[in-house]
């Protein structure tokens, strides 16, 4: 009798839809109008479908073979054979998933090995893994700061930092992007608070600007504050040895806590981490809600990430190559007359300012065989629409030149250059 019941349920698993209530209708109308407004303003985002591995040359679901210039795959490790093999091997030895949070039964030897490798890479005392850097930032501030404390944040910090700060009870202050005068004024005004934490991206993701960490550290020391750096767009390739923005400025030992991601240069999978002072990491293990209430990272991803750090420890070849590729792309685009955000980072924003123009430009580039995306409000401020190109160590010079030639053709057609 039980068996028959199960069979009937399986055969009739599609439940009838509930009748739409008046409240449901009103909500649907409101949401539909909001979506219509987004479309009319040229701000509607669509998702193109890729049917190959992430790489510099990919195929979309409509069969197009295109060059990819918009991935965070800075070191070209997303489809690296060694990284893939490490993930496959871990499937056999450690399984697919852990079905648990860390403090119950979700910690394997692989997780501890990866945390140790990250600590070694950054020269820090301890590391804690998260399912994403968004979660790492979401679980940091409310854990280590209270009502007696102050957090001072750069205005261009990533959304995850902004949301993480909103969750904490500390006094919140904000300074204009890399404005050291404003930062110092906030430090002066907040003297007497129990703890002052300066929070900044190491690299600001929409512009490719690198934070002035040497100047920030000087102020931090002068006013006895702490410093947190989200180095998601720097880990693995910024600095002489790829240790990030703090290494670039020679202040690695002065950063109290870093957050970063495994989902960009470090293989492009998923996962994030916080690394820094031992006491901070220990408290996060006890009280950080995204850590305590989220499943641990799956073993194949962890093993692949360990392999990434092994690859990075061998040489700086990939770091040097992405730097050279970015320099070549910037030089050719500038020579062609495009308006670029200045810098040396492989994030190279091509400024178009108008959202509809950015979308049309990206669409015409796709017809040329170059995959990029237009960025516009609310991802960037109103009137600051752009195409954010991202250069990889895996790009060949021929691929870069082909992309630039396509930019030039489209730019001339649309009157941009």
Question: How should these model regions be labeled?
Answer:
Residues 223-226, 233, 238-344, 357:
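Active-site C-terminal subdomain of aminotransferase-like
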Residues 73, 173, 177-229:
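Active-site phosphate-binding strand-loop segment of PLP-dependent enzymes
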Residues 320-329, 334-369, 379, 383-384, ...:
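Conserved PLP-binding catalytic core of the aspartate aminotransferase-like
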Residues 176, 180, 199-202, 237-242, ...:
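Pyridoxal 5′-phosphate
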Residues 1, 15-20, 25, 81, ...:
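PLP-dependent enzyme catalytic core of the Aspartate aminotransferase-like
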Residues 140-159:
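Conserved PLP-anchoring active-site segment centered on the Schiff-base-forming lysine
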Residues 28-96, 225:
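N-terminal "arm"/small-domain region of PLP-dependent enzymes with the aminotransferase-like
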Residues 85-133:
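Conserved N-terminal alpha-helix of the aminotransferase class I/II PLP-enzyme fold
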């Amino acid at each position: 009798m039980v068996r028959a019941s199960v069979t009937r349920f399986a055969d009739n698993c599609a439940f009838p839809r509930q009748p739409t209530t008046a409240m449901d209708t009103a909500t649907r109308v409101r949401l539909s109008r909001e979506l219509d407004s987004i479309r009319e303003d040229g701000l509607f985002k669509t998702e193109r479908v890729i049917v190959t591995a992430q790489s510099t040359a990919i195929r979309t679901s409509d069969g197009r073979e295109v060059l990819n210039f918009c991935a965070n795959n800075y070191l070209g490790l997303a489809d690296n054979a060694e990284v893939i093999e490490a993930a496959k091997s871990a499937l056999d030895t450690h399984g697919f998933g852990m079905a648990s949070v860390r403090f119950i039964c979700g910690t394997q030897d692989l997780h501890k090995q990866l945390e140790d490798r990250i600590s070694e890479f950054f020269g820090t005392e301890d590391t804690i893994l998260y399912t994403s850097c968004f979660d790492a930032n979401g679980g940091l501030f409310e854990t280590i700061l209270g009502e007696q404390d102050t957090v001072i944040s750069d205005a261009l910090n990533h959304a995850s930092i902004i949301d993480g700060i909103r969750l904490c009870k500390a006094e919140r202050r904000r300074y204009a992007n890399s404005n050291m005068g404003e930062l110092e004024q906030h430090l002066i005004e907040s003297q007497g608070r129990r703890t002052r934490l300066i929070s900044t991206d190491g690299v600001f993701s929409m512009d490719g600007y690198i934070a002035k960490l040497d100047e920030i550290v000087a102020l931090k020391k002068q006013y006895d504050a702490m410093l947190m750096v989200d180095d998601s767009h720097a880990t693995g390739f910024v600095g002489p040895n790829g240790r990030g923005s703090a290494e670039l400025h020679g202040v690695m030992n002065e950063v109290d806590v870093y957050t970063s991601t495994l989902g960009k240069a470090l293989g492009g999978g998923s996962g994030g981490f916080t690394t820094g002072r031992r006491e901070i990491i220990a408290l996060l293990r006890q009280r950080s809600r995204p850590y305590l209430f989220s499943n641990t990272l799956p073993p194949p991803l962890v093993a692949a990430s360990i392999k990434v750090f092994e690859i990075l420890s061998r040489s700086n070849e990939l770091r040097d190559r992405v730097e050279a590729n970015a320099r070549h792309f910037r030089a050719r685009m500038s020579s062609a007359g495009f308006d670029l955000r200045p810098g040396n980072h492989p994030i190279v924003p091509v400024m178009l300012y108008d959202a509809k123009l950015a979308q049309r430009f990206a669409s015409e580039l796709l017809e040329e065989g170059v995959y990029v995306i237009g960025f516009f409000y609310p991802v960037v401020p109103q009137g600051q629409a752009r195409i954010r190109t991202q250069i990889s160590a895996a790009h060949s010079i021929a691929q870069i030149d082909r992309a630039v030639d396509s930019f030039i053709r489209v730019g001339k057609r649309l009157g941009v250059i």
